[in-house]
Amino acid sequence: MNDDYSKTKSRRLTPWTGRCDSTPLESYIDLCTGRDYDNRHPAILASGEAAFLNSYELSSCRFCGSGTIVKDGFSETGIRRYRCRECGRRFTVITNTIFDSRKLPVSEWVCFLLDLFGYSSFSLTSKVNRNAVSTTKYWVRKLFLLLVGVQDGILLGGKVWVDETFIKVRKGDVEKRPDGKEYRGLSRNQMCIGIACDRENAVFVFEGYGKTSKKKTLDAFSSHIKEGSHLIHDKEEGHSTLVSKLGLTEEAYDSRKLKGIPDNDNPLDRVNELCNLLQQFLSSHSGFNRDDIQDYLNLFSVMVNPPHNKYEKVKKILELGLEKPVLVRFRD
């Protein structure tokens, strides 16, 4: 086996890359692998991204925010460059964004995002897109920063459902009783995720550890539910505060009595479905750092909220990526 192959994690190389004694079949496999890799990772100049990026006209400096900017030629990759008359710095449309200092074209984000929207683990996404695991982790970190606050403007109305789902802390973080046994039920070892939704949109909020409460529920959803809406819930005591504080009408059901009822007849089916999808999503990232739970919930909200077409979701995120100043260096 080629020593270079055994020492690298490059998804471009095969055991026969660079060998002169390969059989015709081995050489053919290596050729196909290289061709596929090159198709997935075009050079920035060949990707056609310059025309797309140059369609965005900047009106202010990417550094100081001044509006006194002038066009100043093009970068070596064909992207329009600007110069600020106020601070004197030069920049492009991708300066101080998630695409700044990139080595791969923006087009690679399309496949990356489509895979994430399909409930793929980050490891699988890395393999499918033939990227190094470190690249995928770096991009995920950028995406999480980009999506901070993405749920802030969601306002639910009409019929609104609310419920909670739970995930366990990681094995190494499990707290035990003095006798060595784990705490039972909705203990401090369970992370509480609040879910509120109407017919079209949904909000996902990490509420803390253990059982929800009136304060947790109010803090999570008071800014996301229109006053006068109709709340449908499972008689959880913490939900009552939303009814009283926001002037809501309500329907309350005993969830134990709804078990076994067909989904179409279950009045809590809308929120139950989201609970199940969220559990499926989190299971695909089973070893994730629980400190990042709200970041994962922000990503999931993009996955299940409008627009429902995946390509329109990609467009939305790429536009946000060019508009929102988020800068992360690989070694940060």
Each language-model region and where it sits:
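Residue-level recognition of single "structural anchor" positions
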Residues: M1-D332
